[in-house]
Amino acid sequence: VVASSLDDEDCDAIDAGLLLDPTTGRLWLSYGTYFGFIRLVELDPKTGKRMEGNEPVNIAIDCEATDLIYRNGWYYLLGTHGTCCDGPNSTYNIVVGRSRKITGPYVDNVGREMLQGGGKMVIAANNLKTGPGHFGRYIEEEGVEKMSFHYESDFRQGGRSVLAIRPLLWKNDWPVAGDEFHAGTYEIESERRGYALEIAVDFVRMQRDIEPFWIKPTKPLKNIEPQTLKEVEAEWPKGEVKVRMNDYMFRPHQKWSIMPAGKGGYLGGPYYKICIEGTTRYLTATAQHDVIAKPEFTGEDAQLWRIEQLTDGTYRIMPKAVPGTEEKLALVSLGDCTPGL
């Protein structure tokens, strides 16, 4: 037995969380529920049994389903706070504190100890889903992390409890729940310069009435309607078209429709197909490590894209495969105006 509890104790021996300390090789277990203390004990990393003579340490209250993380010199204690098991009325949310020592004290962003009920919010009810709880961390690779948890109730799924996977971000050495990506129409903008991805077609000027800016208007001002696909598409070249980066002007050749491809997925999302909105011009990776717009969707791996938010909050867009190589490559800006892989 590693830990146990009786009915009249101030700690329930459930909801275990483990951390093998990468700095010392020591193995630690946190456990407990909302109705008492969260406790920490040390285990033998070889046997999994409790270290002889080790006494539990109280490290938090008002939470349960705890998990321990070590990162950048900090130990993190994540716990689930609030009420559970009441569907759409559940107030579960995930909170965190951190410490320079595994045994605490774990303190939140405003200096409150978790042993006194503190905790910085990581994720709460959102997007018609209530009661996020039971945090887990998965490091996919350097710079790409995911957090697993469940919602007590998803209003769009009959109020059922559902599994969730979100990007895990780090801001000022605090864990933050990343964004839930949705299909839609987007500008694809580079981090390098802020230019937008577009197909390489001629820029079509918009006509306007010219009045000197220093003269008071003589008639009511009219809104300028955005340029439409119908106005410009007929002049675009047929077949494959090159892709480039340029100033974003919300023109039709810069608006990308991102939709699930219906061809499998990866941890946290489906593969997507990406095309110019309203057309069949699909973003495609090439053997030359660049990208083009093909005039049709073939379903090839070079047209299937995984979209992930990285730990710094930026996004990575990466083809399932690039022709001629097994190397994992992502969409990047080579210089200000040239996209590549």
Predicted feature descriptions by range:
Residues 12-15, 62-65, 131-133, 252, ...:
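Beta-rich catalytic cores
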Residues 183-341:
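Lectin-like carbohydrate-binding module/patch detector with strong preference for beta-trefoil
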Residues 15-17, 125-139:
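Signature of short aromatic-glycine-proline-rich micro-motifs recurring in repeat-based ectodomains
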Residues 131-133, 161-162, 326-328:
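Short, surface-exposed coil-to-beta transition loops
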Residues 1-14, 20-63, 70-123, 142-185, ...:
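Beta-rich carbohydrate-recognition and catalytic domains
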Residues 17, 67, 95-98, 136, ...:
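Residues located in well-ordered beta-strands
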